């Protein structure tokens, strides 16, 4: 589907796999939401959980996703026959856009989004468009004694993607 809004972060085409469509531009997750609020949010999935009801007829899927301003929880409760389409499209590392309503989950004891529609999206990559590239003098990687989570190969690949001609690691 073609999304009905322009975004600096989200590409304009999306793949709808649950519901009828997305008609609103997404809000930032950092805004305050309450029970009953109807929202459209986007984010990158970083964790998922799944369960099947005791009778085997209902699939319960929980996804945790973030737009880098905050994080929210998405809970999909659907017939078991829909489980594969949900599991294959909502995975850690994938980005989604969701329209739904905030509801209090009495089982998890927190607010989560019950979706009407969910679509897979692609995010626009950050670019360094400067003619003269900047110099980063200090980085920590997993090779550092200091705490770091970025592998050196990821930093080298990002520098290459931004058009840097050289990189030095000491």
Please name every model-derived segment.
Residues 1-170:
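Phosphodiester-processing cores and adjacent nucleic acid-binding clamps
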